[in-house]
């Protein structure tokens, strides 16, 4: 992936942030968002980041290799976490928006433009933004944010796997796999499960 999209904007803007989230669909764990700003005129091949892509298309090992490199070469980056109890209270969409806004607010310097993966965004600050469908596969800064969000969340869920070994969080990361649903049926929900996410498989409405 290249920074061609950013290059088209850099003549007039220097601080462009990509943002993306991880963890909207799981039954357990937080939703995580990341924001990344690269230096103006940054070229990925000079940093060994030309293999960057949408995090879902990358192997776990490659994501883990790329994440520290992204942090090293980014001008600014930030990650924000919204826990399951907040998700249950305000719903997953609002929690995702809050995570994205918190990530942007945590950057050491505010961006002049935000590039958002998806088709909806509700900014808290008066910063211009663009929503880009499948942006994590098209825009370098968004792809970088997707990797940081995904690796951060995976680390959280792997730790939960040690705390709650019956559930296998380190394997499915909270997503509704057959083994995860069976574990909920057998052992019930943990404190890190989202109570508002109901399971038709268990007769919940």
UniProtKB/Swiss-Prot annotation:
Example of a GO cellular component annotation carried by this entry: ribonuclease H2 complex
Main location: cytoplasm
Matches recorded under NCBIfam families: PRK00015.1-3 (NF000595)
Keyword vocabulary terms for this entry: Cytoplasm, Endonuclease, Hydrolase, Manganese, Metal-binding, Nuclease
Localization, UniProt: Cytoplasm
Cofactor: Mn(2+); Mg(2+)
Name under which the protein is recorded: Ribonuclease HII
Highest taxon in the source lineage: Bacteria
Recorded catalytic activity of this chain's protein: Endonucleolytic cleavage to 5'-phosphomonoester
Physiological role: Endonuclease that specifically degrades the RNA of RNA-DNA hybrids.
Residues reported to bind a divalent metal cation: 20-21, 117
Cofactor binding note: Manganese or magnesium. Binds 1 divalent metal ion per monomer in the absence of substrate. May bind a second metal ion after substrate binding.
Keyword presence, Hydrolase: yes
Known EC number: 3.1.26.4
GO biological process, any: mismatch repair
EC primary class: hydrolase
Residues covered by the RNase H type-2 domain: 14-205
GO molecular function: manganese ion binding; RNA binding; RNA-DNA hybrid ribonuclease activity
Keyword check for ATP-binding: no
Organism for this UniProt entry: Chlorobium phaeobacteroides (strain DSM 266 / SMG 266 / 2430)
Annotated family: Belongs to the RNase HII family.
One Pfam family linked to the record: RNase_HII
């Amino acid at each position: 992936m290249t920074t061609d999209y950013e290059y088209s904007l850099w003549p007039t803007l220097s601080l462009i942030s990509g943002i993306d989230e991880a963890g909207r669909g799981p039954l357990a764990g937080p939703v995580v968002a990341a924001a990344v700003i690269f230096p103006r005129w940054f070229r990925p091949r000079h940093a060994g980041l030309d293999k960057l892509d949408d995090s879902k298309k990358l192997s776990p090992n490659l994501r883990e290799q790329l994440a520290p490199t992204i942090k090293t070469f980014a001008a600014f980056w930030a990650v924000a976490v919204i826990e399951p109890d907040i998700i249950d209270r305000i719903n997953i969409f609002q929690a995702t928006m809050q995570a994205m806004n918190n990530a942007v607010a945590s950057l050491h310097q505010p961006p002049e433009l935000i590039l958002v993966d998806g088709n909806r965004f509700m900014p808290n600050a008066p910063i211009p933004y663009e929503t880009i469908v499948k942006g994590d596969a098209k825009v370098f800064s968004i792809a970088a944010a997707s990797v940081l969000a995904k690796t951060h969340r995976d680390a959280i869920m792997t730790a939960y796997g040690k705390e709650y070994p019956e559930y296998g969080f380190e394997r499915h990361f909270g997503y509704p796999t057959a083994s995860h649903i069976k574990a909920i049926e057998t052992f019930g929900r943990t404190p890190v499960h989202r109570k508002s996410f109901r399971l038709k498989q268990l007769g919940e409405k």
